[in-house]
Amino acid sequence: MSDFELEKALAAWRRALRRNPALDDGEATELECGLRDEFEELVAGGMDPGSAFQRALDATGSAADCGPEFYRAKRTRRSARPPWQAPRLVPPLVWSYVLTAVRKVRREKGYAFINIAGLAVGLACSVLMMLWVRQETSFDRFHIDGGSIYRLVTETKGPSAVTRDARAPTPTGPAVKAEIPEVVDFCRYRTNKNYGIRLGDKALYDAVIGIADPSFFAMFTFPFLKGDPKTALGDPRSIVVTESVARTFFGADDPMGKVLTIIRDPYTVTGVIRDVPENSHLRFACVIPAVNMHEYHHVDFDSWNSMFFNCYVRLAPGASPAAAAAKMTRLVAGRLGRPNIGILAQPLKDVHLKSDFAFDLDNHARGSASTLTLLSLAAAAILLLACINFMNLATARSANRAKEVGLRKVTGARRSDIVRQFLNESVVLAFIGLALALLLLWAALPLFNGLAGESIAFAQLADPGLLAAVLAVTLLAGLLAGSYPAFYLAAFEPARVLKGNFFAGERGRAALRKGLVIVQFALTVFFIAGVLIVDKQLRFVRTKALGIDTRQVVTTTVRSERHREAVLADPRILAASISAPPGLAMRAAVDVAWDGKDPQDRTPFFPVPVDPGYLETFRAGMAEGRFFSRELASDRTDAVVVNQTAARVMGPGSPVGKRLTLTAMSMEGTTETRTYAVIGVMKDIHQSSLRRAIEPTIFTWDLGPWLNLRIDPNGVPETIAFLEKTWKSFVTEFPFTYEFLDDRYDAFYKQDRRTRSILGVFAALALFSACLGLVGLASFVAERRTKEIGIRKVLGASAHGLVLWQSWGFLAWVLAANIIALPAAYYAADRWLRSFAYRVEPGIGPALLAGAFSLAVAFLSVAYKAVQAARSNPIDSLRFE
């Protein structure tokens, strides 16, 4: 240690000490004096200089230790950590990257805002869709045996179309359990909202009552608070209620063994379950045994022509659903004697999202898998737009960081270090964007719930799995956004950068930016054009002639002809009909035969019960012949009217006068065969949404449970009050309920309107994100071309010409995006339009409107910066040249 040099060692320690931001010069000098004194004492004691200096240094403290100690001494909170020092759980290098990213945000606020705002919007949309997807895909997942439960769907193949019915023939469940080994159990189920539940003066008239086989609670997992799920529905007059219903009628008392009244019959409470979860397609306030339907609706449980229930089966472990469905098809088709009948096994988990069948349960809002997929892709596209903005602006402004990269490389940084630094910076910005995204989501979630008809709660984000997915998406977005800039900047050659030759090869970078802008606006134009085409179709379905006038028609339930006559006594009631109103799900198909019918023709005909007031009430028209008349008693028993579609199926020539033989297959199980004479042909009526083609229909004089009234458009509230008063004179145990016919037709397209609205919002957000990026690029170009603009102004260029010159390049990119996006948008829209039997031709209008709008918005985005640059004084940019 004889060659130890004290001054050199002190100089090195002093330099490290003075780099510490917690120490001022006086404190550093004081520490140095203390170190010298300690060193001299140790040397005087006989220690060699090198060891003495090390011992003194240990006693005084290293430069890294002294800084935090002095920092804490100056703070009232003794545990405070210096802001430049990494938190205890964060590696120092990562903390350095975080600080660099924060400084960059402070230094370039405008560009940081564009990046963070874009990422925040994209992440907010993505997190929203993750919440929605999680909620929609959680339906019916809580049942213990849910993976082996299937709903049976009846498929009927006609000559031109295939119809699917969510019900199955009533005896299907017992038959398949007895004859098909794969079927372990079955349960038939349906709901009714018209029975009501009563106990003395208390009543729940609008309660949804489930009607099921005794196996219902053994097959489906609804936790019991009281009672035995295996025996709860064993007695025909037993009832299982939810805890809310039990609380409503019995308060804190034990409901077991108590009696509730449904219709006029007593039912004994044999079980209490927890309230049905929101994510269940089986929704009810109580459940009663299905056997009562023989009494209430004359259901024939042994008739294969009876279609009254949804039927669920539970398959054995390892059983093939396809093989079981094939066996069930053979069984049902054989019992019915109809080879065009098939049975599909729909997984329980698919019922909520993948059900577009006739006679489906209508007491819950069905979802749409295609809508969910479409909106998820839209959210992902908006996030991609934000990532493209980040890439574009980072590469465009790479000149500002070129020397930093060059110096880092000269001082020993490897390429991987540079890549890691820039990736970390982009990830930090992504997580800052996530924080802002969560604030946006919290504020916007109530608006989205109202728009989509959902009940998504912000608190659902506390779910560990979902939270992990959100963090993973944010991390991936940060890595994606920073990937190209990181590798691009890391590839800089220090010598060329430090010599000022950075802009060599700018043409390649400009081409990349051009491509990314085109991708951005292509996605945006795709959304805009798609929304415009969807809107055009929805306007078409709203204005298309339906064959009837749905305005000012009120539908309610009816008890008798006397009820109809009582309301007709009021002059505000213009017409009345006891019939199945248009817009209601049609009855089960009937077999129809006539002279000359092709034996291979299996076209289903659908019966509709009407009375002579039907034409006047709904303002339908006759194409040929006449309608039913109260003056002719034979019309009630021997006559039918067919629609134009049925007349075409029956062949050329007039069907009036022909004899039709009907074999009924009603939901009550009627199998009677009768012959009628065709007395007229009614003009076609759209009985359902325009997604379905008009079916061959037979109108019979057969009173239904609905009273349809055409009312005077003046004084509607008074008319409704009169109808309620009249109702109460006939019915005392149930409240008066009614529905306007146009509301029922309007509900057919409720989901489509919601999808259009959400897509419209997403299109606006996509446009916002794309324009943010365009504004950033325009600012960069204006900065880069400041001297060129000054020279052009000196040479006589006008401000107007300079604005067009600067804007043209961007507009050309947007025009190219239109050329790419519009064909794709029309193709996607055509696929959606095919779901409608009656649809509009998109035409060129949406393309022109989307193109013009995108070009106009793009021009306005770049024009602001272009005008600023064009109006600048050329002296400011050329004074030093």
Question: What do the predicted segments below correspond to?
Answer:
Residues 194, 210-226, 237-370, 565-751:
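Mid-to-C-terminal secondary-structure elements
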Residues 1-107, 504, 874-881:
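Negatively charged linear elements and acidic catalytic determinants
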Residues 124, 128-131, 344, 427-497, ...:
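Small-residue-rich transmembrane alpha-helices
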Residues 81-113, 361-364, 393-431, 442-559, ...:
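Alpha-helical transmembrane segments of integral membrane proteins
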Residues 136, 145-208, 215, 244-252, ...:
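Hydrophobic, regular-secondary-structure patches
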Residues 109, 386-428, 773-811, 865-868, ...:
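Interfacial "coupling" helices/loops that link adjacent transmembrane helices in transporter permeases
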Residues 127-130, 377-405, 480-486, 532, ...:
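A hydrophobic alpha-helix feature that marks transmembrane segments and, especially
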Residues 67-111, 143, 302-305, 329-381, ...:
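Membrane-helix entry/capping segments
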